[in-house]
Amino acid sequence: MSTTIIGFPRLGEFRELKFTTEKYFRKEISADELLAAAKELRAKHWNIVKEKGISEIPSNDFSHYDNVLDAAFLFNVVPSSVRGLELTDLERYFALARGYQGEKGDVRALPMKKWFNTNYHYIVPKFEKETQVKLAGHKIFEEFAEAKELGLVTRPVVVGPFTLLQVSDFEDGVAPADFVDALATAYQEVFAKLAELGAKRIQLDEPSLVKDLSAEEKALFLDLYKKLLADKKGLEVLIQTYFGDVRDIYSDLVQLPVDAIGLDFVEGKKTLELVKGGFPADKTLYAGIVNGKNIWRNNYEKSLAVLEQIPAENIVLTSSCSLLHVPFTTANEEFEPAILNHFAFAVEKLDEIRDLDAIRNGQGAEALAANKELFATERVGENAELRARIAGLTDADYTRLPAFAEREAIQEEAFKLPALPTTTIGSFPQTKEVRAKRLAFRKGELSAEDYDKFLAEQIDEWIKWQEEVGFDVLVHGEFERNDMVEYFGQNLSGYLFSKNGWVQSYGMRGVKPPIIWGDVTRLNPITVKWSSYAQSRTEKPVKGMLTGPVTILNWSFPREDISIKDSTLQIALAIKDEVLDLEAAGVKIIQIDEAALREKLPLRRSDWYEDYLDWAIPAFRLVHSTVAPDTQIHTHMCYSEFTDIIPAIDNMDADVISFEASRSNLEILDELKAKNFQTEVGPGVYDIHSPRVPNEGEIDHTIEAILAKVPSKKVWINPDCGLKTRGIPETKASLVRLVEAAKAARQHLK
């Protein structure tokens, strides 16, 4: 038996890649300096994996922004709008991810979507009529050669052709089948070049195989691989799957002339059953047995019990998915040992994979004994009062009265807002000064009184600016918050916070998910102080800003000893108490963000309701069910595909919902219209994840497109998402255009 991982975190132990790349974006360092720093980081990571005793080391799992974008770039899947710009390869690459606005042109970034059921976001490739698929990139070869210079023969990794097609957009009437032959040829060219460089095996990531597959999709997969595998150019091929099981394609998959197949034994409900039914003796099974998505220690006894049932002769132990979904290492954390011993970040998961391999080979008795002792000890007690409160919930606790239509009329009279009311999603730019003041306060270098004074000044400044520009519903800006989940978690029992537990979310943005350690209750009011202060500074309504229970759960590392449903209901009751306190303090518009609602939606449609939506949607309703009819409840969702769960979203019974929409070309509007969506909506009118400022007239056209699909009385005008990560100049310029466009659109309604 040997060991490997599917992939390793990219940002670095201390987010070195993030800070270096941001310097490049600010033109503080050259492209050569960025590339040199990235090369140094890769070498460091390979060395860590090697020193941990992992026998097969992957390469090309590193990315300057996103691995799906890397694959698109490798195969020349670059939209004509970007291909025509006179830019360097690196500039063109980042233009696809971030947009480009300069002397050489003005192009929007490609859309961004959640990567399956994770909080990682990928850039969506675009296939057009003009797309000529061919081998165009060189990153995969350069990184293999780099590792070889260090004495390492790595296993190159690239997104497989089926998944590349499945996660892409197609325009101009083209379809995935149109690119099968060209993709097969291009992948074979990759095989040939890697074999020439000395590679032995390539990993083709095909997570799309774990979803529901139609007959057409199965045929596409088999056609691709029949052509692709007709000539492997002397290279061994591993088809690697993750995030679930491959029940729809298993019988075909095991008959393909591949050398190895990677299966997920953590999230794959039927993986063990499939393998026990037979696995080819001439293939190697890469068994994903260590959870790549959560931070809890692996229970060796349970993992070994699974491994003992696998009939395959040739097994490589691996992670269930890439380790980019967990933090780098626990070595920099300050938890007491009794807590820290329960956690395994990426580096520690290497130890776990090696331990399991050693135990299987009769050499890991000490590691097994220590692991047994860890799991034999009760980790945390339960809150009996909270458990009783949840047990006592009835249907009435999940139902808001009066019904939506009656509330809508009451709120229209209460707020007297103009047509197409304008607002933002919540946060304003967090400047260096804001971050420095927060850090100084945390370190005790700034008094609470001085910090509060600073925050009040920030709120005053932005409330005044919003009034001057002409916004209808204001926000306080969230200057007191570092992260929309961590901020709440710090005021909830049962939560722990890592010091350096950063995980890549999109591009160079990292998030630091808190850890749900025990039962969750609210310790004290969380947002009332600054929301009520902001409301006192203006006659216009100011939104109270909360993070919803499902998003708090999905953006945390959840417990594994109780169900995520039970954890979510605990959080929902805590946020419900906060909602009622805000309402009592005079805050009459309350936004409860559910940005991550889609994130843990099962990948198979048959599991959507029973396993998730049947409790996730009621958990949201529980939060706001007892507010007064003249209190308006907003929610916000971003960067996921929502079109197929529109009825469930309407069933959340919010009064207003804002969606990410501009970057995905307002695709959601047709579905809202088709499903007769009742909730008032704010489809984002410009993309905040790109630094470019919308052109004059751009937002006007977007509003026009929205009004063609949604009745004007149902429409709100807002950006795609919060503005925390943007700069002040671009933010103000964009928001001024937003308000001007809304005012112009109102004139056309008259």
UniProtKB/Swiss-Prot annotation:
The keyword Zinc applies. It catalyses: 5-methyltetrahydropteroyltri-L-glutamate + L-homocysteine = tetrahydropteroyltri-L-glutamate + L-methionine. It is an enzyme of class 2 (transferase). L-methionine binds at I425, G426, S427, E478, D593. One of its GO terms (molecular function) is zinc ion binding. The active site is at H689. Its EC number is 2.1.1.14. Zn(2+) binds at H636, C638, E660, C721. Its cofactor is Zn(2+). Keywords: Amino-acid biosynthesis, Metal-binding, Methionine biosynthesis, Methyltransferase, Repeat, Transferase, Zinc. Gene3D superfamilies: 3.20.20.210. This is 5-methyltetrahydropteroyltriglutamate--homocysteine methyltransferase. The gene is metE.
